[in-house]
Amino acid sequence: MTRIKLCGLTRIQDIEIANKLKPEYIGFIFWDRSSRNVSAIQAARLKGKLDPEIKTVGVFVNAPAEQVISYYNVGIIDIAQLHGNENEEYIKKLHDAGLTVIKAFKMKKAGENINLAGNANIETPEKPTGNAITETYGKSTDDVITEAVKSSADYIMFDPGKGEGATFNWQLIKGIKREFFLAGGLTPENIEKAVETVQPFAVDVSSGIETDGHKDPDKMSAFVKSTRAL
C-alpha cells in the first residue's frame, strides 16, 4: 500500500479533514519563505487536534539541528523532513535524538536539462538563488540519485521544487532499491500514473490539493481516494 502525506496544513479545518481521510502523515512547514509556513505555537495547536494515529512531519530548510530536535522533544513533530544542505553529520544528530528522518533531493523539473548519458540536453534555466532543496544544479541526475540512495536518512524524497506544483520525469527513478517519497506536481488526476510508474513507498502532496492557496477538502478527499484505490 502506498502511504500518503498531506503537506502544508495550516488551519484547524485542514486538520479536521485530515482526521476524516486518515493519511499516514501530515506535514507542517517551518520555513519562513513558504506561504504555508507555520510557527511552533501554531503547529502545536494543530497537532493537538490531530488524530494521534497520523504522524506529523516537520519540514525544515537548513534549520539548526537543535531547533528540529526541540520540536520533536515537545511533541510537535514525529518526523523531520530536510530540504536544505543538511549533511550526514546533521542527520546523525537527529538520529541520536530519536528522530526519523526524510531527506529530500531535488530533481530537475520536466523540461530542464537532465544530463543523463543518451538523453538529449535541453537548455537549463538560470540557476535560481537560494536553496530550498539539496542543490542539484551542476550535478547530473545520476549523481543526485546515487547520493540519495546512499543517504543515511530513514527515507529519501525525490522532489523537483518547493511547492511549485511541478513534476519531473518519473522514469528516472523507476526501480530505485530503497523506500522513497515521491513529491512534485501530484494531483488526484495524475496520482494513478505516478504510483504505477515508480511504486513509491509514499506520495507527498501540497499544491495539488489546494484552491486559491488553501487546502481544498474536495481535492484532499479525491487525492486520498484515488491513491487508496491503487
Describe the predicted segments one by one.
Residues M1-A117, I122, Y137-F158, G163-L230:
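Conserved N-terminal beta1-alpha1 strand-loop-helix module at the mouth
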Residues P128:
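Cationic, low-complexity basic patches in intrinsically disordered or flexible, solvent-exposed regions
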